[in-house]
């Protein structure tokens, strides 16, 4: 293939540049770019840059300036000092020619940027760059840098600069500090950028003074003023970086603060001035002096500011108006501590805080119209945090605190008004992003109100209770009522019994009857907000059972609303679970209510699941097992009907399929009905779980008799098992059915006894029906893990048989993936977790160690070691946990056969484990895995006397994954690990060694 010929003349290069800026095929443009880049980077690039800048075309000139930039970035280190000075003069010379010939700003700005690039590479030899560039522009020629010694004062030079050259200096100066400010800290120190830039601060202040302060009375070019303000902003932000990096304060800049602020009333300069001071207040308020803040206070009190503020509050959300609001908020953020502490004595603070409260009440809906509300809420969150900090850090309540509380209460009242939903037709007309943002803003208000309770206490609760009662009196103020209820629900974590008198007013009001109306005038949002209140105060209903019937009647009436059924059923379940004991006398009514729901088929399936779980929790609270039997039978009859309906539908669907008959429209699929039945069983199982705070009866008999497993209650278990078995057989390839059946069993596996605490062999039968091909078999393995935990709690010999059979089943899954964890990580992880749970109880060790055939046991151990060296994080984590437990097994097992088996296993597997751990720590593991992998290493060192020799052999093995560490470093690592004897510091040593093996710059030997 012939080598592509590069252009040999300047005209050819110019032609290529012109082609580049014309629309053309992407391939052609890419090829031109590639050719031009080769030319730019070639040794002739310097000459090319000069040639292109001599063109009459703006595009070609721009490309010439770009070529200088590229050459500086690629070849600056090869330039001698004299050559570098020549390049500087050439670039300045071209800038002067461009300005004199009236070039457009694109080329002038590019040349200014190129000069900044030059400074970044040669800052030491061009320290007073602004003074030198200004002198050259005034002279109209590029003179050597050392000639600035002959230059007049900067004030004289600045006064003699025409506007176009002033703009060039401003562009260069702003870009200079912006680019230096982007430099990382190491480069900043290495190149001493701060040291050199600081030498220019008085020079730039002189230039800026000309553009910002009108000392002559002659009108200043608007463009020069705007660019002066932008440049001033860049230098102020850079001064913040200089202060943070090196405690450098650029005091001369502060002389411009007040003159710059005065420009805010100039319409042409308003936008840049507001942006500048909002930026300073938000990011570097310490730049401003006390006098500057006084001037800002005066500004916000002026008629100009009052007019701006009034426009914003009246619903003008144009960019400039919102900018003013942001400016006011930035001032509030910067002075928030003073505002809070001076509120009771300083009229200026009162005025500012009053204005900040007002920002929360601007006309218009949040987000859709009102663009200042969300940042205003953020300010009040900062205000609250500040007041809390100031008031909690003193011994006595400060005198300003009541006034600070009062203004916060005013802010919250404004928030309450604004958080009310628009009319439904209005809200639905917004786009999805606006609706989501509106709801986010409401959550922000909720957070503010919740946190405010820490400062305002019960008076805040009382205020929302009063608002609720007023809305109830009005009868149809649904938006107000919804907002008030939503706010009241926020206090659930902060108020307890002391709030009962306020909640009495709410729950004793006509609110229940209002919201239980059968007509459609009550918005679903208002009902849902009341649900949130009920959910938030379950302990209240335990103390005030007289309100329980009203609450439950309301909830049951809401079950028929498609939009509220799911959340309502969950609320019913939560309330019944919390108040289960007091609801026992109402159990018959609940069963009757559920019977009607089932008969009418009037609610969604998920609503049935919630309600049936609620009833089960009431059954759990009955005084003895015998009393639970009949109501449980009634509950299971409902489930049985759904199950039988599913089987009937399934047979009908088979018949239709055989005869090519279409399934009738609207008919529910058989599997959906079956899933509803199984999920109802899950809800029943969860409802029957004994609450965690129930006292343990220490006098319970330790015999193995169980009413549910051995007595009259066994019929309940048999019925459930029959339903689950039939479902499993009817839908053998249905992963969701398999998963939900697993969940049913797991609800009982956490219980010591109960209707759903099945004998282990019953659960095992379900597990053994599954194999590697079973959809969602992972959930079945997890059930096996739960079952092994349950078996570990008793000494029953039958449990040992079940555990042994489960181990055989799990080993079969490992065999199905060819004993390679990477073939199916999702299967591997829970399988290894099963092994870990099996050995977590010493009495089960013999089950693992006596597993037959021995080849299968060896495969099991090797499977975990392969997972340990694999790339899949979850199996690796489980394997690390397994080995951390296995190597630290007690050495005094009373069963000598088991003890000998442990010893033999570790003698054979210890070196392999050490090799796997060292392989990971030698760089093969991910950094996030190191802490977990350090656990078996620490246990190995503590518990195994041969650990050092095993680890040393692994470090010296040919399979060690890194060549970045030598033998000496490996031995240092081993010595540190052994000396730590399993202490937590091992993790740090492992991390350091891993870094060294990865080839980082970390100096390991220290």
Where are these regions (language model features)?
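Karyopherin-beta/Importin-beta family HEAT-repeat alpha-solenoid scaffold
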Residues: 2-1006
């Amino acid at each position: 293939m012939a080598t592509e010929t590069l252009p040999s003349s300047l005209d050819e290069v110019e032609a290529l540049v012109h082609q580049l800026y014309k629309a053309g095929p992407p391939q052609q443009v890419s090829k031109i770019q590639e050719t031009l880049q080769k030319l730019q980077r070639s040794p002739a690039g310097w000459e090319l840059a000069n040639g292109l800048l001599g063109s009459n075309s703006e595009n070609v000139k721009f490309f010439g300036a770009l070529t200088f930039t590229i050459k500086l970035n690629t070849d600056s280190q090869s330039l001698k000092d004299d050559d570098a000075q020549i390049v500087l003069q050439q670039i300045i010379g071209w800038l002067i020619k461009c300005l004199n010939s009236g070039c457009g700003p694109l080329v002038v700005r590019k040349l200014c940027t190129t000069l900044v690039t030059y400074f970044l590479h040669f800052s030491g030899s061009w320290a007073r760059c602004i003074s030198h560039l200004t002198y050259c522009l005034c002279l109209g020629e590029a003179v050597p840098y050392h000639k600035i010694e002959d230059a007049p004062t900067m004030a004289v030079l600045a006064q003699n600069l025409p506007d176009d050259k002033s703009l060039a200096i401003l562009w260069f100066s702003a870009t200079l500090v912006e680019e230096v400010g982007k430099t990382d800290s190491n480069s900043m120190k290495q190149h001493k950028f701060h040291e050199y830039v600081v030498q220019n601060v008085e020079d730039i202040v002189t230039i800026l003074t000309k553009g910002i302060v009108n000392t002559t009375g002659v009108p200043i070019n608007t463009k020069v003023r705007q660019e002066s303000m932008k440049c001033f902003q860049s230098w102020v932000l850079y001064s913040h970086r200089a202060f943070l990096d090196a405690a450098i304060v650029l005091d001369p800049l502060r002389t411009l603060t007040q003159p710059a602020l005065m420009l805010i009333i100039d319409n042409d300069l308003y936008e840049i001035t507001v942006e500048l001071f909002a930026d300073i207040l938000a990011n570097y308020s310490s730049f401003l002096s006390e006098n500057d803040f006084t001037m800002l206070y005066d500004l916000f009190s002026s008629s100009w500011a009052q007019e701006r503020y009034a426009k914003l509050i009246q619903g003008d959300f144009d960019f400039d108006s919102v900018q003013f609001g942001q400016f006011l908020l930035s001032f509030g953020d910067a002075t928030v501590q003073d505002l809070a502490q001076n509120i009771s004595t300083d009229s200026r603070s009162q005025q500012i805080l009053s204005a900040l409260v007002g920002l929360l009440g601007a006309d218009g809906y949040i987000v859709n119209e009102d663009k200042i509300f969300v940042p205003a809420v953020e300010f009040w969150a900062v205000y609250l945090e500040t007041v809390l900090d100031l008031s909690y850090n003193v011994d006595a309540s400060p005198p300003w605190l009541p006034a600070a509380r009062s203004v916060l209460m005013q802010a919250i009242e404004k928030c309450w008004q604004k958080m009310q939903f628009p009319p439904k037709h209005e809200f639905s007309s917004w786009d999805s992003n606006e609706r989501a943002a509106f709801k986010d803003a409401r959550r922000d208000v909720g957070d503010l109100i919740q946190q405010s309770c820490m400062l305002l206490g019960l008076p805040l609760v009382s205020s929302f209770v009063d608002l609720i009662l007023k809305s109830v009196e009005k009868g149809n103020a649904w938006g107000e009522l919804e907002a008030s209820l939503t706010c009241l629900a926020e206090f659930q974590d902060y108020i307890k019994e002391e709030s009962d008198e306020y909640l009495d007013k709410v729950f004793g009001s006509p609110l229940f009857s209002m919201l239980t109306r059968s007509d459609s005038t009550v918005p679903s949002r208002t009902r849902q907000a009341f649900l949130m209140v009920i959910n938030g105060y379950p302990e209240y209903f335990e103390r005030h059972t007289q309100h329980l019937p009203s609450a439950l009647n309301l909830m049951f009436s809401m079950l028929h609303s498609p939009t509220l059924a799911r959340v309502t059923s969950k609320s019913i379940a939560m309330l019944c679970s919390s108040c289960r004991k007091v609801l026992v006398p109402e159990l018959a009514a609940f069963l009757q209510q559920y019977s009607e729901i089932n008969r009418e088929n009037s609610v969604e399936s998920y609503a049935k699941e919630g309600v049936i779980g609620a009833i089960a929790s009431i059954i759990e609270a009955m005084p003895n097992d015998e009393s639970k039997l009949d109501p449980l039978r009634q509950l299971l009859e409902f489930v049985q009907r759904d199950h039988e309906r599913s089987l009937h539908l399934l047979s009908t669907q088979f018949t239709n399929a055989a005869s090519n008959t279409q399934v009738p429209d609207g008919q529910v699929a058989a599997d959906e009905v079956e899933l509803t039945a199984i999920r109802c069983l899950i809800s029943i199982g969860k409802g029957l779980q004994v609450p965690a705070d129930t006292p343990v009866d220490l006098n319970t008999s330790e015999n193995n008799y169980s009413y549910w497993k051995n007595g009259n209650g066994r019929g309940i278990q048999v019925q459930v098992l029959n339903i689950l078995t039939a479902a499993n057989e009817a839908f053998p390839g249905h992963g969701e059915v398999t998963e939900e059946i697993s969940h049913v069993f797991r609800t009982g596996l956490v219980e010591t006894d109960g209707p759903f605490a099945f004998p282990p062999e019953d659960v095992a039968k379900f597990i053994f029906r599954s194999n590697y091909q079973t959809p969602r078999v992972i959930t079945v393995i997890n059930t096996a893990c739960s079952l092994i935990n349950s078996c570990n709690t008793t000494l029953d010999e039958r449990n040992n048989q079940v555990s042994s059979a489960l181990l055989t089943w799990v080993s079969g899954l490992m065999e199905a993936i060819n004993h390679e964890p990477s073939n199916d990580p999702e299967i591997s992880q829970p399988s290894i977790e099963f092994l870990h749970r099996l050995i977590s109880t010493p009495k089960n060790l013999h089950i693992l160690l006596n597993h037959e055939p021995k080849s299968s046991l060896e495969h099991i151990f090797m499977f975990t070691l392969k997972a340990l060296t694999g790339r899949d994080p979850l199996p690796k984590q489980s394997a690390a946990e397994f080995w951390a437990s296995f190597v630290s097994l007690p050495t005094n097992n009373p069963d000598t056969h088991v003890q000998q088996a442990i010893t033999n296993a570790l003698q054979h597997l210890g070196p392999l484990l050490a090799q796997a751990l060292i392989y990971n720590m030698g760089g093969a593991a991910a950094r996030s895995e190191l802490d977990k992998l350090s656990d078996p290493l620490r246990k190995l060192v503590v518990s195994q006397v041969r650990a050092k020799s095993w680890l040393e052999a692994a470090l010296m093995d040919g399979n060690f994954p890194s060549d970045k560490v030598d033998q000496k470093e490996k031995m240092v690592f081993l010595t540190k690990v052994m000396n730590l004897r399993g202490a937590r510091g091992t993790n740090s040593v492992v991390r350091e060694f891993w870094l060294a093996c990865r080839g980082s710059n970390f100096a390991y030997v220290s």
